[in-house]
């Protein structure tokens, strides 16, 4: 393959001093794997609701990670796979069942599992093999060729991450696949970001953390990582007074850290 991949211009905003990083860690969901690629199947299963269902599912999934991490010192922790299912069930109940109930003027009463259990399982199975963004494989191969250590640092369970990596064809391209599950705390808890330092043996300021989730890029920046926010959808960044080290529009922007 070519020695370099043309990268889109990246906006450097810079909290950290300019320095060459020694490793790269990627968020998984939304960054390497397209969480909204389930919308097509969702539309097939729930006509007229596919896009809205995929968005609400994702929003509720993130909300649940924060809820179980911050409430009562994590006493209500559940693995990411369980929260993913719970968020999906919530989204279906809100968007599909509530609408049907409204049309029936409140007279609808169903057994959720009997009526929707198969659809739920099909969507969860799809979540195990989400589409990867098209440039990602070439970027990971390029980093591997350059000898730059890479890894995933994700809220996902280990089994979920292993399945997604395999399905995307990324096996052998990542040196670390790090799940927060052993510490029972989701990002943006500082202990979650600390796992990257522990796995690589490097200080956070020597690592680029890459995420397409603005809240995640912000949390990693606050922790001390050099950060790349992959702003695929041309959105504003969080308005909390801190910017990521760089902003790009796809994963190729990470190569700008290694001129």
Where are the language model's segments positioned?
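Asp-based, Mg2+/Mn2+-dependent phosphohydrolase catalytic module
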Residues: 2-21, 141, 153-259
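Active-site neighborhood of HAD-like aspartate-dependent phosphohydrolases
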Residues: 8-62
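Hydrophobic side chains within well-formed alpha-helices
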Residues: 38, 53, 119, 170-173
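Alpha-helical elements of Rossmann-like donor-binding domains used by nucleotide-donor carbohydrate transfer enzymes
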Residues: 40-41, 56, 86-90, 122, ...
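Hydrophobic alpha-helical core bundles mediating ligand binding, dimerization, or RNAP-core interactions
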Residues: 42, 57-61, 84, 123-127, ...
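A metal-dependent, Asp-based hydrolase signature
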Residues: 45, 51, 64-122
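Short, acidic loop-to-helix structural element flanking the phosphoryl-transfer center
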Residues: 77, 81-82, 101, 114-151, ...
